[in-house]
Amino acid sequence: MGAFDKIKRRNLDYLLIETIKQIGVSNYSLLARMTGINPETVRYKVNKQLTKYGLGVQVNLNHAELGMSAGLMVVDAEPSQEWLGEVSYLFFEGKAIGASKYVGLYAVPFRFKKKYIDVMSFLKQQKRITDYAIYEAKWLRYPSFRPEFYDFDAKKWKVDWRRVEMTQGESGATTLDVNRDAEVDYMDVKILKAMQENPTVSIVKVAAEIGANPRTLRYHNAEHVVKGKLILNSNVRWRRPAIEGKPGELMQMLTLVKGVGQEGVVKTRKVMNKIPFTWLEGGSEVGDYFALLDVPMDKLYETTRYIESNTEDVRSSLSIIMLDSQKSRYLHIPEEMFDPKRGWTLPSYRQEMAKIGDGEERRHS
């Protein structure tokens, strides 16, 4: 392939990736119309070529429109303490390397927000965890894939840190915290879970899998999921280590600054948004900030040095936690917590917690 043909192909790849960010990958015809690429070529690129490039598509939910409050939890727990299976509504969980420390991203229905934190206190009281910290997110953002720093043919990042430093602004979809519940039904939850499991799935296929009328499901998708903006965006992610079964080539990193005020958050954000490996960031009302990165092992030293050298103003409040990529999990919308009649529910251990709490009150009355 000549140099001109390579440039032409690369421009088409860039265009397709930018369009996927806007509309997802489930509608090949719409992708074809918006990009001018032949529909069959679009189908091939989405189903085959992205994987060959070491990339994948992640569907991110709009927690605000789902009536959910999101945040970060950092938990200290010994291996002998059984607790992780007791915590629901997580959409990411990971374990620190070389420490009995765990991190989780959660999105819990607004009406359960206080009880959710009470659960963590209950687990600590029962000595099922050693300690915990909750950082409630006022906002979450999913930074966009940065194709200008990616070598598609070599399937790896090619980062010029001088160009990184010149990055201006930020890109990506943001969801804000809202103090309200949302009207979501069982069909909506089924559609969202199916799309998270397989971003290319068609509504007809989802209907067949759950035994629903395709017309009914199309209505729910159009009127609730799409118009209700229940999906925030579809983001292209670097997935080569997972695709090739080489988790040792990936280091996941949590960067956390605590209590630095809004000025400190803004300064830290500017640094983290320049780094092309950042895939999620969030901030609280009280000046906490966190970011999650998927860093190639051959870029770990450079990335850590870049963060440290550009965050001197918040150095005393900065923590960098390295996560074991083999023990990380991305979780879909918790369908099992949704009752078709009652909506979102509390898991059974909360009832156990309430009984113990009632007993304590009776003993002290």
Listing of model-derived features with the role each one plays in the protein:
Residues 1-365:
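A compositional/biophysical signature of low hydrophobicity enriched in polar/charged and small residues
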